Regions:
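Short acidic low-complexity segments
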Residues: 191-206
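Mobile, glycine- and charge-enriched loop segments
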Residues: 60-93
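Polar, enzyme-active/binding microenvironments
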Residues: 73, 81, 105, 299-316
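Core catalytic region of metal-dependent phosphoesterases/phosphodiesterases
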Residues: 55, 82, 87-193
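Short, basic interhelical loop/turn and adjoining N-cap
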Residues: 22-41
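Conserved beta-sheet core of the metallophosphoesterase superfamily
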Residues: 209-302, 307-308
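Short Lys/Arg-enriched helix C-cap and helix-to-coil transition segments
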Residues: 44-66
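Short, amphipathic alpha-helical "recognition" segments used to contact nucleic acids or chromatin
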Residues: 2-20
Length: 319
């Protein structure tokens, strides 16, 4: 059979429709091996990624190009970065209440929630633990809107509101896109539709020197590996560890930052830890830029959840 000729643009369109080297090969008249070679060539030429379906039929994560990375320039000002809120309808945490107060007090230029604002345990691939009560998707969405509303009400004029996409957040549209793909594009089927005042991104680069995204490396040395391997300051959530690791070399000093969690580490959604000790801390990070340069980052840490106490700059603050 003679090979069908198609342009790069046609190949990209066909690939995104089928997401399978076998199916694409049949459509354009190439062997699977040659189809994969053509795919790699096009990815290199156009600087794109052509994802394939996983063997179990679940598609890999696809984020539209315009959401992949936000590039921000800030000369002088503060960015507040909280993460891993896992907002629970049963309880408003000390970290969240404190974060809202800091938005009022510090008047940041940008507020970033660094992934996992939702928990979505009820649509997780992990089994329910015993008869554990889990909030419904609607209850979680209502809680998210209310808590984000707390921040929206106190933000200073011109303050940008941004969210990086976390693995828990992806559960929402991930389930819908696989069960009801025919509803793609309908308002409400993406979690971002429920947070209209916030812009969602995969990552946020500040001044080309500070990357903010939900996760990269794992383990106890995650933030060290993030900053040393990226060559830039790197701010992540996901691990709930709330810490800073500086790294200095010939290029100067940069920082690996873990933004901890804005949840209460004793909350019911973390019962999967089986009451084992976890190296988690509740709080958030404060990034200050002067003349475009990131100053040593700061942390605000919850030191007593029950009493609503937060430690920051040598003081105990009650919220």
């Amino acid at each position: 059979m003679a090979k069908k000729v198609c342009t790069d643009e046609e190949f990209i369109t066909i690939w995104r429709e089928h997401q399978s080297p076998d199916k694409v090969g049949k459509a354009i008249g190439l062997s699977t091996r040659n189809t994969l070679k053509r795919r790699r060539t096009i990815e290199d030429t156009h600087g794109i990624v052509l994802d394939a379906l996983k063997p179990n039929g679940m598609p890999k994560i696809y984020i539209p190009d315009e959401q992949m990375q936000a590039n921000i320039t800030i000369d002088n000002g503060t960015i507040l970065v909280g993460s891993d809120c896992h907002y629970n309808p049963e309880y408003v945490t000390t970290a969240h209440r404190g974060f809202v107060e800091f938005v009022k007090y510090l008047k940041p230029k940008i507020v970033i929630l660094n992934g996992d604002i939702a928990d979505f345990a009820s649509i997780s691939k992990h089994h329910r633990i015993g008869w554990q009560k889990r909030p419904t998707v609607k209850e979680e969405l209502d809680e998210i809107q209310e808590r984000l509303g707390d921040i929206e009400k106190v933000r200073p004029a011109g303050c940008k509101l941004m969210i990086t996409i976390g693995n828990h957040d992806l559960r929402y549209s991930g389930l819908l896109s696989n069960l009801t793909p025919q509803y793609e594009g309908i308002k409400g089927f993406d979690i971002a539709d429920h947070t209209p005042h916030w812009k969602w991104y995969w990552s946020i680069m500040v001044n080309q020197t500070c990357m903010i995204k939900h996760r990269w490396h794992n383990g106890i040395h995650a933030v060290y590996n993030n900053t040393i391997k990226s060559g830039t300051s790197f701010v992540t959530g996901h691990l709930h560890s709330l810490k800073i690791t500086p790294w200095t070399d010939y290029t100067g000093t940069r920082y690996g930052v873990d933004t901890g969690t804005m949840a209460c580490i004793k909350d019911s959604q973390f019962s999967y830890t089986e009451n084992n000790p976890v190296n988690w801390r509740a709080g958030w990070a404060i990034l200050t830029f002067i003349n475009g340069k990131l100053m040593p980052p700061e942390l605000a840490e919850v030191v007593n959840e029950d009493e609503g106490l937060i430690y920051f700059r040598g003081q105990l603050l009650k919220v």
